[in-house]
Amino acid sequence: MIHPDPTLFGHDPWWLILAKAVGVFVFLVLTVLAAILIERKVLGRMQMRFGPNRVGPKGLLQSLADGIKLALKEGITPAGVDKPVYLLAPVISVIPAFLAFAVIPMGGEVSVFGHRTALQLTDLAVAVLYILAVTSVGVYGIVLAGWASGSTYPLLGGLRSSAQVVSYEIAMALSFATVFLYAGTMSTSGIVAAQTSTWYVFLLLPSFLVYVTSMVGETNRAPFDLPEAEGELVGGFHTEYSSLKFAMFMLAEYVNMTTVSALATTMFLGGWHAPWPISLWEGANSGWWPLLWFTAKVWVFLFVYIWLRGTLPRLRYDQFMAIGWKMLIPVSLAWIMIVATAHSLRTTGHGGWASGLLIAGTVLTFGLAVVLWRTMRFRADRTVPARTAADVFPIPPIPGRAGAARTPESRETTDA
């Protein structure tokens, strides 16, 4: 197992840096094309239909055909839009999606034409904070798209998206705090190296579950796709977009899905380390093999996205915000205090007490989550009290019928 030497970053020749940047871009684009096709195929199987099956063998070229179609369609700019902002919004949305992947480690140290390099474009001492900052910029594109469209539905979708990102970005950042405590670094390659013996999904299970919930809300995917809810907002923030501009929004959505899936792999599933029992093979974590393990883990999370979309209904807006503010954030804060205490005990030589505290803390955290969830369910299931006749707005008398203003109850009695 060869972990990248931190001194390698920034010393690659220019052609190797360019090759790695192009490689990351191609990896993301191919993943998006495959994810769209597989999503449609899997949803088709879930709904007892075939899915795409006309373009290419078994429909394998459907995503490519859709991309070409969108690129060649006529671009229509509605009247009344703020044109410069309207055209700039898709670009602001898609560029941060690609930039965030620059610090994701996709493998260990390899040799390319005699040059030792890491399968990672670059790394920073605060790489995870860089990812959080860059992904937060993408929401500006959504908000500006809603504002510049000059329509009510896109504006509501943009405002929903901004509130959604603010709410779930806090929970996502809190889930990372425990990882920073255990790894002792915010560098992505350092966090992967710290998981050589044990993945953090086993040590920090509550943090992992909070992150998985937050990443679905962060990327505006079902059942948290409120900014583009078709039944409420037609198409949400991209209602007024078509052709290549609409394709850029869709590209940004799927690239963001890939990025947060890769971040989950890096933070909790050991990054590019081979899973057990493959890790028993001596060469599993050397050479180009780690790229395969990394890609497989990313696809596990992408399948979770597809699975959730095909099985869960969309939440109401108040339910969605309540989950973020009333459950995820309080649970994360309680779990951080438990992990910080356990980490202090471990560093002072009380490993047994630390392990027991983590186990008890996990149980207590799940108990707190259940209590908060039941409280929210009780508030959501409250019945509306029956209204008396005095509370009902009176119905004006109908022409041709005698009598004063009637309530619905009196009308039913009279009609009967």
From Swiss-Prot:
GO BP terms: aerobic respiration
Transmembrane segments: 16-36, 84-104, 124-144, 165-185, 197-217, 260-280, 288-308, 320-340, 353-373
Reaction catalysed by this enzyme: a quinone + NADH + 5 H(+)(in) = a quinol + NAD(+) + 4 H(+)(out)
Keyword Ribosomal protein: no
Assembly information from the UniProt record: NDH-1 is composed of 14 different subunits. Subunits NuoA, H, J, K, L, M, N constitute the membrane sector of the complex.
NCBIfam families: PRK06076.1-2 (NF004741), PRK06076.1-4 (NF004743)
Designated name of the protein: NADH-quinone oxidoreductase subunit H
Species: Mycobacterium sp. (strain JLS)
Gene that this sequence comes from: nuoH
